């Protein structure tokens, strides 16, 4: 249904029936129009039917736009819902005052016909007074529409809240006028009284309802007599009474019109034409049928000829269509803003959930700590009570024995005294003398009995404890550590200040993307400047032998220029990095030597290798697999993150998600940076020395510096409000202006081919990322197979290399004779690494761009040897610099013929061959990451050389099979692994046999490949509460892997030791989680807290069962009984000792003799 509303703001003070805002309603739905065409009626004639009325009555309002809009069905009240796909075409226009914003759509005119199709809640909100809750479809209620789009009856309109003075343009210049300010009782928004208009949506809907449903009560719409209509003019679209029909037929202009009887009129032909026309307030007899574009108001024909003479005007239908387009644009913008608001609401909800989860977690930890202390206090109290009872019982027994002896003696004395006294007083002399001997003996015997007059005092038993000391220290029992997050740019700027042009093809994009593209272009321009300086410096190096003295002067000048240029570039880079840091929170890791290294020219941006499993998976293998393994590329990054950059990882993750939602910043595009690799990779013994040597070396000495990528830790796919802008796809040459600029820049600065006769070849960085840069900038590049058979100057050929190329991957890394796999990331993005030379202005770029090396292996090694002969060699460096290794990374190194680029036209067809029939998997079987992988020739599994067990020293040559496929008794191949046994013969004799070693390696590799074993591959972080208090002998699979190597000092002597350690990993997990169940007694929310720890416990049980099954399969002839853990034995012995009386420190005998009042100290 089409609705037009327009009003003027400066015509008066808003009457009840003839307000300043004059509104004209002309309704028409798509369905009604189609049906009208099928009925051969005039298209301009609006019709009223139950179907058309059910779509919104007087029209449906747009979502927060200044005009009303109709659609099927009407949207619910705010927040505004997204419009249906057909809404922009059916949206209505309203040229009202700027202060009026509509948000509502009136209900269907007939409740009987629309009750089944339209929900009741939106109807009540749209056609009901917000104060008295009465229906507004009454003609006498005078419905009013407020600027906040709430409808009120005229009697329910709130009284003016205050008055303000507004400047107005008067006849004599600037003037002021007092305006009433009112406040909506529903939404409490302030508005001016003059901005309030009649709600013609409801009024005309009510009239349309009465006319379309009850034809018997239809009144004439051509006159003002309110006479009953008996006919309907099809051409005019008006109901006519008997008098009007006669007049209609008499007038020459309308006498040919077709008039139907009321009973014959179909609802489709009537439509909403039963609405009364809105008449001009000046010319009472003229309807408002024109729209003045100049004045933005509805006019009648007379007004257009008089007051609006020579103004631009349109008919209502044409103006309605124009306003529809404007409204559709506003709707698009508002829908985008609605998405941002909903995303912000969801983020707030997430933060609330995080707060609740943090509360539960910390509460759980506090209860564990308190419960642990309570347990220890109870134990100590029971032990003290037991010791006290033992001491007092012993003393009581001794005193009771003395008491019995004394009682017996006292009775004996009384008896003897009584008998003697009776014998003396009552007995005869003969009897006394006769019994004297017995009486005297008994008296002497009792007299000899030794009785102490004062028994020895008891030794004092005292309890020494300072309650005040413990009460004071309870304050320091535990503290809450609240980590502060770095301040970020307010997200409101992103939502409020975004401007989207009407009719934009991509409504999801924001203006901040232009800044991002400019940022990238600035980086490339800086890299171009650095490239020019590199050329100049290389030129000075070539002339060094001829003009040594002149070279020194030029070198000093060049260094000064470089320092100035580097300072400028460093300042600009710091500004850019600050913006990048605000957007992605990826600040550079503070390393040793960073101030010296940061003086390099700013590196180019690197297209991020896709994130994997929601964790921190950047470029997993920046080097070939036998290079330094980057810690930042692993799934277990959170444990290493606080050590690397000093910032807690869990608190950083939500902040990154908020900052990535701001499209005005750099987004998820990491920057290559130079770092001290030894901090990230402890297994590299010489990388630190190389970095330090580079810092103390002059600018003319070449060096191979490892490059570390800082990956973004936020998956952009999880951010719905991010702009839908793809990263710079450097592989698709010519696809964008940036790509063309980049291609021209690279081709203009490319060096000629460096052959073996070149006196000073430029050193190149042995990095697949660097070679990926070379290949990605060329529109067409030859594949690795195109270099087969090509010869260098020495006449030797490069061995053909099988490269597993995934769809969409433009980066190639070749190994001689081995199957090397370059993977695309899991989210489908191409792994195109674009970086500058790591030496900055000190090192020239790669000699050949876009082509695979065609020179011989010996030439390459000799060329590299000349460049790095002054550098210390590391075991972890690429075997490209080792002449003894046959597995050579040929991609990215210098060839001998620059004309090889001419064969680049067949590159794409060759690289895409064989992609579909590749039987190998796409991800490493252990770490589930992509990168350069070794493909087994007998099974589909692939591995990184550092993930395989045993770990390989370098990439193998020829056919290769994994540990799963190799024969245990008689292996087909021997691995080139850095696992030389110790020279001590005794240790070799005590070690496992080679077959047992291979069996243990296969069993451990099975465990590593289990999908639930990730939690057990690394040591448990110290942040896990009370873990190292409960677990006294921690163990992890990586430690088992190291101990399985024969060079390890604690190498396993038998498979039983190996099995025992693996079982210890899972028993520790079960023990820790079993301990956590004790907290149920003191926890109010038992199930939730226990369930939080049960996931790792269930994973431990599953992997343990899997390990036992594989153990029976690999060692069928051996049995490995479960040995009681050392910790359990120690605890059992400790409990036995606690129950005994040995813990009581007995008093020394020397003090017993000296001091009878000895103090007995009890533990």
Curated annotation (Swiss-Prot):
Its EC number is 2.3.2.27. Residues 1-119, 524-555, 575-599, 656-706, 753-848, 867-918, 1128-1147 are annotated as: Disordered. GO terms for biological process: developmental pigmentation; embryonic hemopoiesis; erythrocyte differentiation; fin development; macrophage chemotaxis; macrophage migration; neutrophil chemotaxis; neutrophil migration. It is found in: Nucleus. Residues 45-54, 88-99, 524-533, 678-691, 753-797 have a biased composition (Low complexity). SMART domains: BBC (SM00502), BBOX (SM00336), BROMO (SM00297), PHD (SM00249), RING (SM00184). Residues 72-87 have a biased composition (Pro residues). Residues 27-38, 821-830 have a biased composition (Basic and acidic residues). Zn(2+) 2 binds at residues 280, 283, 303, 308. Residues 991-1114 form the Bromo domain. A zinc finger (B box-type) spans 215-268, 275-316. It catalyses: S-ubiquitinyl-[E2 ubiquitin-conjugating enzyme]-L-cysteine + [acceptor protein]-L-lysine = [E2 ubiquitin-conjugating enzyme]-L-cysteine + N(6)-ubiquitinyl-[acceptor protein]-L-lysine. Zn(2+) 1 binds at residues 220, 223, 244, 257. Keywords: Bromodomain, Coiled coil, DNA-binding, Metal-binding, Nucleus, Repeat, Repressor, Transcription, Transcription regulation, Transferase, Ubl conjugation pathway, Zinc, Zinc-finger. It comes from the Eukaryota. A zinc finger (PHD-type) spans 921-968. A zinc finger (RING-type) spans 129-188. Residues 345-369 form a coiled coil. GO terms for molecular function: DNA binding; transferase activity; zinc ion binding. Residues 534-548 have a biased composition (Basic residues). Pathway: Protein modification; protein ubiquitination. Residues 580-590, 870-889 have a biased composition (Polar residues). GO terms for cellular component: chromatin; nucleus. May act as an E3 ubiquitin-protein ligase and a transcriptional repressor. Involved in the regulation of embryonic and adult hematopoiesis. Required for normal development and survival of both committed erythroid progenitor cells and posterior mesenchymal cells. This is E3 ubiquitin-protein ligase TRIM33. It comes from Danio rerio. The gene is trim33.
């Amino acid at each position: 249904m089409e609705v037009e509303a327009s009003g003027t703001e400066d015509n008066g003070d808003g009457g009840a029936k003839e307000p300043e805002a004059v509104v004209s309603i002309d309704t028409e739905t798509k369905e009604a129009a189609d049906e009208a065409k099928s009925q051969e009626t005039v298209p301009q004639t609006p019709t009223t039917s139950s179907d058309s009325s059910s779509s919104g009555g007087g029209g449906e309002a747009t979502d927060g736009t200044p005009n009303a809009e109709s659609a099927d069905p009407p949207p619910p009240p705010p927040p505004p819902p997204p419009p249906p796909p057909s809404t922009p075409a059916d949206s209505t226009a309203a040229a009202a005052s700027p202060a009026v914003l509509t948000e509502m759509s009136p209900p269907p005119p007939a409740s009987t016909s629309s009750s089944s199709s339209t929900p009741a809640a939106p109807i009540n909100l749209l056609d009901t007074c917000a104060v008295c809750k009465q229906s507004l479809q009454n003609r006498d209620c005078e419905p009013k529409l407020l600027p906040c789009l709430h409808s009120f009856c005229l009697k329910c309109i709130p009284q003016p809240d205050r008055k303000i003075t507004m400047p107005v343009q008067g006849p004599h210049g600037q003037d002021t006028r007092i305006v009433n300010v009112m406040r909506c009782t529903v939404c409490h928004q302030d508005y001016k009284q003059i901005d309030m208009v009649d709600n013609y949506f409801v009024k005309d809907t009510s009239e349309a309802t009465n006319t379309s449903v009850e034809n018997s009560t239809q009144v004439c719409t051509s006159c003002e007599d309110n006479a009953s209509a008996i006919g309907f003019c099809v051409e005019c679209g008006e109901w006519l009474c008997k008098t009007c029909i006669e007049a209609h037929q008499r007038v020459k202009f309308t006498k040919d019109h077709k008039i139907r009887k009321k009973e014959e009129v179909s609802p489709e032909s009537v439509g909403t034409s039963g609405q009364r026309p809105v008449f001009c307030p000046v010319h009472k007899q003229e309807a408002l049928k024109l729209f003045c574009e100049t004045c933005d108001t509805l006019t009648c024909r007379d007004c257009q000829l008089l007051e609006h003479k020579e103004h631009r005007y349109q008919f209502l239908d044409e103006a309605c269509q124009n306003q529809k387009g404007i409204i559709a644009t506003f709707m698009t913008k508002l829908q985008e803003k609605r998405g941002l608001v909903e995303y912000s609401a969801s983020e707030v909800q997430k933060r609330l959930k995080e707060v609740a989860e943090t509360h539960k977690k910390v509460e759980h930890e506090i209860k564990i700590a308190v419960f642990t202390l309570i347990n220890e206090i109870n134990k100590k109290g029971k032990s003290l009570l037991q010791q006290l009872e033992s001491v007092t019982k012993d003393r009581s027994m001794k005193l009771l024995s003395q008491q019995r002896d004394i009682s017996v003696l006292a009775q004996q004395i009384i008896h003897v005294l009584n008998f003697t006294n009776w014998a003396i007083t009552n007995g005869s002399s003969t009897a006394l003398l006769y019994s004297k001997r017995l009486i005297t003996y008994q008296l002497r015997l009792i007299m000899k009995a030794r009785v102490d007059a004062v028994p020895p005092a008891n030794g004092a038993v005292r309890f020494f404890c300072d309650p005040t000391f413990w009460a004071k220290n309870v304050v320091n029992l535990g503290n809450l550590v609240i980590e502060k997050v770095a301040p970020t740019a307010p997200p409101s700027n992103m939502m409020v200040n975004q401007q989207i042009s009407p009719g934009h093809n991509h409504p999801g994009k924001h203006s901040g993307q232009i800044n991002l593209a400019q940022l990238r272009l600035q980086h490339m321009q800086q890299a171009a400047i650095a490239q020019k300086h590199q050329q100049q410096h290389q030129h000075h190096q070539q002339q060094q032998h001829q003009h040594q003295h002149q070279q020194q002067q030029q070198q000093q000048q060049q260094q000064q220029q470089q320092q100035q240029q580097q300072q400028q570039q460093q300042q600009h880079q710091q500004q850019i990095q600050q913006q990048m840091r605000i957007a992605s929170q990826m600040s550079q890791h503070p390393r040793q030597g960073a101030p010296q290294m940061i003086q390099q020219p700013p590196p180019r941006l690197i297209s991020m290798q896709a994130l994997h499993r929601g964790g921190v998976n950047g470029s997993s293998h920046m080097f070939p697999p036998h290079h330094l393994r980057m810690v930042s590329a692993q799934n277990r990054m959170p444990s290493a993150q606080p050590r690397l950059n000093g910032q807690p990882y869990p608190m950083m993750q939500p902040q990154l998600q908020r900052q990535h939602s701001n499209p005005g910043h750099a987004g998820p595009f990491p920057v290559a940076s130079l770092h001290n690799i030894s901090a990230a990779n402890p297994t590299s013994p010489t990388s630190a020395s190389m970095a330090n040597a580079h810092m103390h070396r002059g600018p003319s000495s070449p060096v191979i510096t490892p490059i570390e990528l800082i990956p973004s830790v936020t998956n952009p796919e999880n951010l719905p409000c991010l702009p839908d802008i793809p990263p710079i796809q450097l592989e698709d040459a010519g696809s964008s202006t940036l790509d063309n600029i980049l291609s021209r820049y690279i081709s203009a600065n490319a060096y000629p081919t460096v052959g073996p006769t070149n006196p000073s070849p430029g050193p190149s960085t042995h990095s697949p990322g660097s070679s990926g840069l070379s290949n990605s900038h060329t529109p067409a590049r030859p594949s690795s197979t195109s270099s087969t058979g090509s010869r260098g100057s020495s006449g030797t050929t490069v061995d053909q290399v099988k490269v597993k190329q995934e769809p969409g991957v433009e980066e190639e890394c070749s190994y001689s004779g081995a199957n090397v796999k370059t993977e695309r990331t899991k989210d489908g993005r191409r792994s195109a690494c674009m970086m500058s030379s790591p030496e900055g202005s000190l090192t020239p770029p790669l000699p050949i761009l876009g082509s695979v090396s065609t020179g011989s292996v010996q030439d390459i090694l000799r060329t590299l040897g000349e460049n790095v002969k002054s550098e210390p060699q590391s075991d972890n460096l690429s075997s490209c610099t080792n002449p003894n290794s046959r597995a050579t990374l040929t991609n990215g190194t210098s060839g001998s013929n620059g004309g090889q680029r001419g064969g680049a036209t067949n590159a794409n067809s060759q690289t895409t061959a064989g992609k579909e029939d590749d039987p190998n998997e796409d991800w490493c079987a252990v770490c589930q990451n992509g990168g350069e992988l070794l493909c087994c020739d007998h099974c589909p599994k692939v591995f990184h050389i550092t993930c395989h067990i045993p770990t390989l020293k370098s990439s193998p040559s020829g056919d290769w099979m994994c540990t799963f496929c190799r024969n245990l008794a008689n292996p087909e191949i021997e691995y080139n692994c850095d696992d030389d046994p110790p020279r001590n013969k005794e240790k070799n004799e005590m070690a496992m046999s080679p077959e047992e070693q291979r069996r243990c390696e296969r069993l451990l590799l099975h465990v590593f490949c289990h999908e639930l074993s990730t939690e057990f591959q690394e040591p448990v972080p110290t942040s896990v509460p009370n873990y190292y208090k409960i677990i006294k002998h921690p163990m992890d699979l990586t430690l088992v892997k190291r101990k399985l190597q024969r060079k390890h000092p604690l190498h396993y002597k038998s498979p039983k030791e190996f099995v025992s350690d693996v079982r210890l990993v899972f028993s520790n997990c079960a023990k820790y989680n079993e301990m956590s169940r004790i907290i149920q007694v003191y926890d109010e929310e038992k199930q939730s807290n226990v369930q939080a720890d049960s996931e790792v416990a269930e994973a431990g049980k599953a992997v343990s069962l899997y390990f036992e099954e594989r153990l029976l399969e690999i060692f069928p002839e051996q049995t490995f009984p479960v040995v009681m853990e050392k910790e359990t034995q120690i605890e059992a012995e400790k409990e036995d000792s606690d129950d005994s009386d040995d813990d009581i420190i007995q008093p020394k005998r020397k003090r017993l003799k000296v001091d009878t009042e000895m103090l007995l100290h009890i533990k």
